[in-house]
Amino acid sequence: MTTTLVEGSVWQFDLGMVNAYLIDDGEVTLVDAGTPRSADDIRSRMAEIGYEPADVDRVLITHYDLDHVGGIAGLDLDAPIYAREPDASHFEGSASPSPTNRKGLFQRVVGVWVTRPDEPVRRVEDSIGGFDAYATPGHTAGHTAFVHEELRTALVGDLVTGDDGALSTPPLPMTKDPSRNAESIRELAARELDVDVVAMGHGDPVVEDGAAALADLARRVG
C-alpha cells in the first residue's frame, strides 16, 4: 500500500514488515529500501505515483539492517547512498558489526543476504539536500534521523515504532543499546522540531502533531 503523508511530496511505501519512503522536494529521495524481496514492490509503488527508480537522486539509509538496505541492489539505482558511520562501513562491507552483543551477532548472520553497493557509501554528517541529519544511536551505533523541516517531516527509522498515532520504543532484543536509544529519543524531542509527520520503519506514521507525540514518548522513557 502507498500512503500520501504530505500531498505531492512525501509517500509511505508499506512493504509488509517494514516501511520505505519517497520524498520529492525538487530532488527525489528514497529513505530506506526494505528487504532483498522488496525491490519489485518498491518499483510498483513508485509507478503508482508516477516515478521510477531512475528518478531517484539519492538514497538515505537510517541504519544498517537487512530490512532497511536489502532492497537497494534490486532497484538498479544510479544514485548515491548516504549513511552515518559505522553503519555505512557495515553496509559496504569494509567493517563488520561487533559479535559481542545480540544485535551485532544477528547483523553478521543475516548479512550474507545483503548485496553490497557497487560504489562506496557516502558518509552523512549534519545535512544532505533539504534534510538535517541527526545522530540517533541506540538501535544501531550509526542510526540517523532525517528531518525535512520545510515538509514538516521527520524520518526516524527504528528509533521508534508507531501504532495509531502513538509512538513506542523499538523491541529491546533487536536494539543494540536500549538505554542509548531512549537517550536519543529524548535528545531528538529536545530539539523541538517543527514537524507534523513522524515516519518510522515499523508501524503507522504519525501525521499530525508529530513533535508532540515524540515529546510524549520522551517523557515516558525519561
Residues covered by each model-derived region:
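Short, solvent-exposed beta-strand-terminating loops
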Residues: 82-95, 150-155
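Short glycine/proline-enriched coil/turn segments at helix->beta-strand junctions
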Residues: 25-27, 75-80, 129-132, 149-152, ...
